[in-house]
Swiss-Prot record:
The keyword Hydrolase applies. This is UvrABC system protein B. The UvrABC repair system catalyzes the recognition and processing of DNA lesions. A damage recognition complex composed of 2 UvrA and 2 UvrB subunits scans DNA for abnormalities. Upon binding of the UvrA(2)B(2) complex to a putative damaged site, the DNA wraps around one UvrB monomer. DNA wrap is dependent on ATP binding by UvrB and probably causes local melting of the DNA helix, facilitating insertion of UvrB beta-hairpin between the DNA strands. Then UvrB probes one DNA strand for the presence of a lesion. GO terms for molecular function: ATP binding; ATP hydrolysis activity; DNA binding; excinuclease ABC activity; helicase activity. Coiled coil: none annotated. It comes from Lacticaseibacillus paracasei (strain ATCC 334 / BCRC 17002 / CCUG 31169 / CIP 107868 / KCTC 3260 / NRRL B-441). Residues 437-599 form the Helicase C-terminal domain. Forms a heterotetramer with UvrA during the search for lesions. Interacts with UvrC in an incision complex. It comes from the Bacteria. A motif (Beta-hairpin) lies at residues 97-120.
Amino acid sequence: MIERIADRKFDLVSPYQPAGDQPQAIAKLTKGFEEGKKEQILLGATGTGKTFTMSNIIANLNKPTLILSHNKTLAGQLYGEFKEFFPHNAVEYFVSYYDYYQPEAYVPSTDTYIEKDSAINDEIDKLRHSATSALLERNDVIVVASVSSIFGLGDPHEYKNHVLSLRTGMTIDRNTLLRQLVDIQFDRNDIDFQRGRFRVRGDVVEIFPASRDDHAIRVEFFGDEIDRITEVDALTGEVIGTRDHVAIFPATHFMTSDEQMQRAIKSIAAELEAQLKVLRSENKLLEAQRLEQRTNYDIEMMREMGFTSGIENYSRHMDGRKPGEPPYTLLDFFPKDFNIMVDESHVTMPQIRGMYNGDRARKQMLVNYGFRLPSALDNRPLKINEFEQHVHRILYVSATPGPYELDRVPKDDIAEQIIRPTGLLDPKIEVRPVMGQIDDLVGEINKRVDAHERVFITTLTKKMAEDLTDYLKDMGIKVRYLHSDIKTLERTQIIRDLRLGKFDVLIGINLLREGIDVPEVSLIAILDADKEGFLRAERSLIQTIGRASRNEHGKVIMYADKVTDSMKAAIDETQRRRTIQEKFNEEHHITPKTIIKPIRAAISSYEQSDDDKAEAKKTFAEVDYEDMSKADKKELVANLRSQMQAAAKKLDFEQAASLRDTILELQADMS
């Protein structure tokens, strides 16, 4: 058993002081939480430094904090930023560790059973272990996570109870330690020394923790006593330092004792018997036979090996939970008084709310057709009301908060952050008639091209985007389109080429809202702005308008024959913010300047060595994949996988995620 250190302080390191609207937002939100308010909103316009505000609130409250993001890429960006702000504290990353995941499913219409298939990213698995071990060891922890944090993870009490606490001078037999390491899922391998393994050389045991990839723990025995504990470089064996005490956390989050396993097997067998009676009474003989055969095989594997493929479907029995009870998740590893901050809450909260129903629909089919026991339904993400039970303090962060947040938070508990430290204003907005819109747009594009600036155009359909691209090309304009049919890595290349000036106009649908940051864009044209719907709703329009707020000449033109309620709300909100920003700039004599953002290197189609980095090589977008031989395709995938792992190791999760998505697309083409 280990004791958690509870007196550490968050140490915010930054060359900047809060500026613009940041000081009042930080003070208001901190005071609100200290007064006992449970839910608040940080309504921050694009580019106002919301992450820095969040960091100051974390430092002020000094409580473990969970930052929720709606995808791995944005989680990776946040992780990098918080690591810079809190270099002396534990900033951790917790997302799904699957590079590829095909869930188990059954399609009755074609009688097709799809077996679970997955590939685990070892680097992300290491970071997940690092997050849970940090939460049990100390209080100054920030975990940046995706919605993976509301999926089942294993009982934190069992996980904590299985931690091995080793001290210098402790009396323990070497073989007893080896057995204990095996009990917590470490593998003995004296040759291939990796995470989650240990090796033995006489009276010396070396343990490679699951949460590390560089340092191992060397335990030296003198008889039945631990003589010395040292931290060593896992590759060279060089001693890093000596330790009086070390805690070895289990190599898996899903810890089960022998007693629990035997109890679970009995419980599974009893449920099987009951479910077989139900199926046979409904004359579902094929389903009953299938369920009996599959479940008995799983029980036998658990008896003999302590494990079976798909063991997570029996998690309710393993944990000793009652039917319908929520699973243990990452949230259970936090102490009760932790903070939650939800980034881009207008997207993240609907995602959290929708996870349960999507998972349930797929698994219900497996239960109905005899592939799984009903208890498999309890291996699931949290329902929204179960998530809410974990909330002690929660901050929703968004430029456009959603109805869920706005319904729960009084107006007085919303802190606005509108002023940008850079002085940049929200863009001017004009509404122009649809008649003659393309000719008008061509004239506006030419003005931007002459000024070496870029243009975004948003349409409603892929066909419209492609047709408009062809028309503008015929007019001599350098233009590309971007929509969901474009491969992941090609999208990154297209954005890079736009910034480099290889073309001037990018046409898209809804990919131009969150996550695309191009300071060179000074004009956004919104076609069919008066067509009410998801893509032209108030929140979507405000997010799209925000893409032009990085440039001092930012402007938005909406082409419409009437001003809809959504348009009016978006225009009024943008004008309100712009008025506040202009007044602030006047009072403080600030001149807005376009953000200067470096253009990152393209992802190449091969793994560069130190010797050939200077040589010109093809980028992935230039590779003609269709004409490659099967062997060349395999080599390309292998090279991209190496780059992905290297990017993850450097904590460049945005790059790693792009590479992962490309590998999956290429593998799908190969099959």
